[in-house]
Swiss-Prot record:
Entry keywords, A to Z: Cleavage on pair of basic residues, Disulfide bond, Hormone, Pyrrolidone carboxylic acid, Secreted, Signal
PANTHER family named in the record: PRORELAXIN H2, RELAXIN
GO molecular function terms attached to this record: hormone activity
Protein's name in the database: Prorelaxin
Entry's family note: Belongs to the insulin family.
Quaternary data: Heterodimer of a B chain and an A chain linked by two disulfide bonds.
Organism of derivation: Sus scrofa
InterPro entries in alphabetical order: Insulin-like (IPR016179), Insulin-like_sf (IPR036438), Insulin_CS (IPR022353), Relaxin (IPR022421), Repro_Hormone_Insulin-like (IPR051042)
Localisation: Secreted
Propeptide positions: 57-154, 159-160
């Protein structure tokens, strides 16, 4: 019997020494923060691994891309080289067919000139085109938001944030409340 008690005492001591929750990380502690402190706290909570794990896992790695003007001629060059190699290595291909294939293939210079003509828009014209498209898209999206009633929802969310910030500053708030805004 004394041996059983010594084992139970040993297990109890081991279990009591297990790491516990960090005191400042409790989700039920009241935090009173205003201004920059509140923003820092919000960034800490929303940017931490435990709260933002799903958002980080959904992100896809972005591929590095070069400028499109450089990519296009190189792809044209590769296609031309592949076609030339195919024409050389197919011995049974009649000369007439080889001639028609090479006639159909535009020269590399022609393809590069047509690509550069398309890309040599005046900077001001390019800027105007982009601004016009952005304005059209904004007008359409605002009209759709008004039709769907979503603009009221975003206002409510902003008002909720304002009241929560006032609450955190004056009374205090819980980490879970701040985490809901992430």
């Amino acid at each position: 019997m004394p041996r059983l008690f010594s084992y139970l005492l040993g297990v109890w001591l081991l279990l009591s020494q297990l790491p516990r929750e960090i005191p400042g990380q409790s989700t039920n502690d009241f935090i009173k923060a205003c201004g920059r402190e509140l923003v820092r706290l919000w960034v800490e909570i929303c940017g931490s691994v435990s709260w933002g794990r799903t958002a980080l896992s959904l992100e896809e790695p972005q591929l590095e891309t070069g400028p499109p003007a450089e990519t296009m001629p190189s792809s044209i060059t590769k296609d031309a080289e592949i076609l030339k190699m195919m024409l050389e290595f197919v011995p049974n291909l009649p000369q007439e067919l080889k001639a028609t294939l090479s006639e159909r293939q535009p020269s590399l210079r022609e393809l590069q000139q047509s690509a550069s003509k398309d890309s040599n828009l005046n900077f001001e014209e390019f800027k105007k085109i982009i601004l016009n498209r952005q304005n059209e898209a904004e007008d359409k999206s605002l009209l759709e938001l008004k039709n769907l009633g979503l603009d009221k929802h975003s206002r409510k969310k902003r008002l909720f944030r304002m009241t929560l910030s006032e609450k955190c500053c004056q009374v205090g708030c819980i980490r879970k409340d701040i985490a809901r805004l992430c």
